[in-house]
Amino acid sequence: MGALDGKVAIITGAGSGIGRASALRFAAEGAKLVIGDKTAAVHDTAKLVKDAGGEVIALEIDAGIEADVASLVAAAKENFGGLDVAFANAGIIGDMGGIFDFDPAAWAETLRVNLIGPALMVKHAGKAMVDQGRGGAIVLTASVAGLNSGAGPGAYSASKAGVINLAKVAAQQLSTSGVRVNAVCPGLTETGMTKPTFDYAKAKEVTHKLGQLNPLRRAAQPEELANVALFLASDQASYINGQAIAVDGGLTSSHPVTRQLLGQTSH
């Protein structure tokens, strides 16, 4: 019996990376899926799910537009009879400007996708779950950049800090409903979003340096984040609520320069 047998799940940002890995993982554990992405790659993910024997509906959507988020919830109810899990995973790196040179419009776009998007998922998926009266699980993709400074550009970091607090606020506002809300905080992960970083490292032949600030000394793979999202979505995490779970190889366990300052660079 799979961890999500008999459950219906929505996943956004499912065209690649963590979203695609999660779609495959959730389906393998028995979930019926409604997946969304801004690109046509969502249909490629759907084919992979179907080829593996899963049930899936794929929609091209903008996760920061309310009508699009509502359409995912409607598709879950119309095609599968309800909704048990929502994984608001879509995001963008957004504006790269510093404090003195950022573009307000670009900041607004980053917040629209990265923060308003998850809030819309909480609004619509949460309402559907409350109306059903059988609880549910909402997982939001935040980032270690929302926990500590220095892990991402300003707009991205601010948006992800907002996602973390959104999970806490939503968990409180949904109290007594049986709907849990948690955030997963990836560290450096090899995805479409980080492809420029990995491509640059490969071109410079310095891929061995990626992830060297965390104790595991490597970057994560999307499947490692999918495993955590699956756990938070499943009944195995039934008493975890309003939390931000860092999946970062230990990056946030200490100040990243501590080892170097102490001369403890290896064992």
Predicted stretch roles:
Residues 8, 15-16:
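Conserved glycine-rich cofactor-binding loop
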Residues 97-99, 103-108, 210:
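Substrate-binding pocket helix/loop in short-chain dehydrogenase/reductase
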Residues 122, 159, 167:
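Active-site helix of classical SDR
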Residues 127, 131, 172-176, 238:
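Alpha-helical segment proximal to the catalytic Tyr-Lys
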Residues 143:
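Residue(s) in the substrate-gating loop at a strand-loop-helix junction
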Residues 183, 202-236, 240, 247-249:
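C-terminal helical subdomain
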